[in-house]
């Protein structure tokens, strides 16, 4: 009997400790990064639990607006091959994940880029959406979301477009005609408006989703 009471007491203490952790407030600070687009050919963003909104900039610069805390931050660097990378890093402990996520505003990355000046755009994130405007890049676009949607207006890439979600939908318009593309697509547990396989195009379009719909039009 004493052993049972002791175990119940320890359980209650554990719940109290975890409840205390869940009410802890985290302070976020807004950060801003900018660079002249003449220095950048490729942008590669690798994030976790972040919504990523891509917009067009009003000039020839690239801008990134984001938020950091003492426990969650980003490493931004430009390599010798003109690749701008932004990668998520964290010092959060297990108990820091109790109580839900920070407000969406503090978990949103706003990327503003010039039209037609990038070679490639690569974005990965989890648990939130990726949104893009009507965008043209000279080489490739690659988007991946785990538990989120990919939404875009019109995408135009010189060579390759690759889009993938898990537990999310993919919606938008690809610029061109069906004859332009070699297509691979598959929607597991969802609807697919693209052919699963089509050969003969000089561009590559790959679209995959698990537990989501693919609603993509190809139009000139």
Region annotations inferred by a language model:
Residues 150-220:
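Short, surface-exposed interaction patches in beta-rich subdomains
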Residues 74-104:
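Mid-chain, structured segments of secreted extracytoplasmic proteins
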Residues 23-81, 85, 214-220:
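Short linear S-[DN]-x-LW-Φ motif typified by the pepsin-like aspartic protease active-site region
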Residues 17-20:
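C-terminal motif of bacterial Sec signal peptides marking the signal peptidase cleavage site
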Residues 1-5:
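Positively charged n-region of N-terminal signal peptides that target proteins for export
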Residues 32-34, 51-56, 73-77, 99-100, ...:
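Short, T/G/N/S-enriched strand-turn elements that build extracellular solenoid repeat scaffolds
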Residues 39, 48, 58, 80, ...:
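Repetitive beta-strand solenoid architecture
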Residues 142-143:
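Mid-length scaffold segments of soluble, non-membrane domains
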């Amino acid at each position: 009997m004493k052993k049972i009471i002791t175990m119940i007491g320890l359980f209650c203490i554990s719940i109290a400790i975890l409840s205390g952790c869940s009410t802890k407030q985290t302070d976020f600070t807004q950060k801003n990064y900018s660079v002249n687009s003449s220095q950048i050919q490729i942008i590669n963003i690798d994030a976790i639990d972040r919504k990523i909104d891509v917009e067009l900039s009003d000039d020839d610069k690239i801008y990134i607006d984001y938020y950091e805390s003492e426990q969650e931050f980003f490493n931004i660097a430009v390599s010798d091959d003109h690749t701008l990378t932004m990668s998520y890093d964290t010092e959060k402990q297990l108990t820091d994940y109790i109580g839900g996520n920070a407000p969406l505003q503090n978990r949103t990355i706003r990327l503003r880029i010039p039209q037609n000046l990038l070679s490639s755009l690569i974005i990965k994130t989890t648990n939130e959406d990726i949104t893009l405007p009507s965008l043209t890049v000279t080489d490739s676009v690659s988007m991946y979301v785990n538990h989120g949607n990919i939404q875009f207006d019109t995408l135009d890439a010189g060579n390759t477009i690759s889009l993938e979600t898990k537990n999310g939908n993919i919606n938008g318009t690809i610029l061109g005609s069906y004859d332009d593309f070699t297509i691979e697509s598959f929607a597991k547990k969802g609807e697919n408006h693209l052919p699963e396989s089509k050969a003969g195009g000089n561009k590559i379009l790959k679209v995959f989703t698990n537990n989501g719909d693919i609603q993509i039009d190809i139009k000139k």
